């Protein structure tokens, strides 16, 4: 039983370490990448170009999974979109 708990704990830890971050990637202006009126698969392409594992359109902005630490992720606390 202890081995099973240890095994499951290791799997969860691997998922956290390898899984990467998720969120709305920010563009050069600090804004979310919009997917309003874009083709199907646009966000998945944008996310994989940023070395993420996948992504989808969480209308109206792209949401990515598995992003590396080097990619800026938009947050409401650090929102600089449209501000000078």
Curated annotation (Swiss-Prot):
Where is this protein primarily located?
A: secreted
Query: Which residues are annotated as pro-peptide in the record?
Result: 82-84
What is a biological process (GO) this protein takes part in?
Answer: defense response
Q: In which tissues is it expressed?
A: Expressed by the venom gland.
Function of the molecule = Not toxic. Induces an immune response similar to that induced by whole venom. Induces a dose dependent release of the neurotransmitters glutamic acid and gamma aminobutyric acid from rat brain synaptosomes. Thus, polyclonal antibodies raised against this protein can neutralize the effects of the venom.
**Family in the record:** Belongs to the long (4 C-C) scorpion toxin superfamily. Sodium channel inhibitor family. Alpha subfamily.
| The protein, known as | Toxin Ts4
């Amino acid at each position: 039983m202890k081995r099973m708990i240890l095994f499951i704990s290791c799997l969860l830890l691997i998922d956290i370490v390898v899984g990467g971050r998720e969120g709305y990637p920010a563009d050069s202006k600090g804004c979310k990448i919009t997917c309003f009126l874009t083709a199907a698969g646009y966000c998945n392409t944008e996310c994989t170009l940023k070395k993420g594992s996948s992504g989808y359109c969480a209308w109206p902005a792209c949401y990515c999974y598995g992003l590396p630490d080097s990619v800026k992720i938009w947050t409401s606390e650090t929102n600089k979109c449209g501000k000078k």
